[in-house]
Amino acid sequence: RKTYESIVRPLPKRLNIIVSRKGYDAPEGVVVVDSLEEAFAAASATSTLPSALSSEVETYPEKCFVIGGGQIYAQAMQIADEMVITHVHTVIEDADTYFPVIDPSIWQVAERSEIHTDPETGYNFEFVTYTRK
């Protein structure tokens, strides 16, 4: 829920699912569930799509993208076969959410992008795809 609130509005052309144990008054077209398991079930059930959205949503039947927070990341890592991670090469002093440690005995680097620089912040970052060993 907190991650969704930080984004401010639903991400376009996809089904947005919020996982919240406390419930959440989400805008139309956003699905709210109690657990990660329910989120995966909602993602795979086309009946969860409001008819107005169904023609606009790009479907990825075999992929779910988890965008936070820390507890959800840790749960998703236990069942994922692949992770696409943006590594930002900086330290944020007042950060309150951290991605769990990626255990090299479980995950291997399958692909790594070149290092990019964000023009607004000046932070260097790269995209790394990990696959389960």
What are these regions (language model features)?
Residues 1-133:
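Enzymes that bind and transform nitrogen-containing heteroaromatic metabolites
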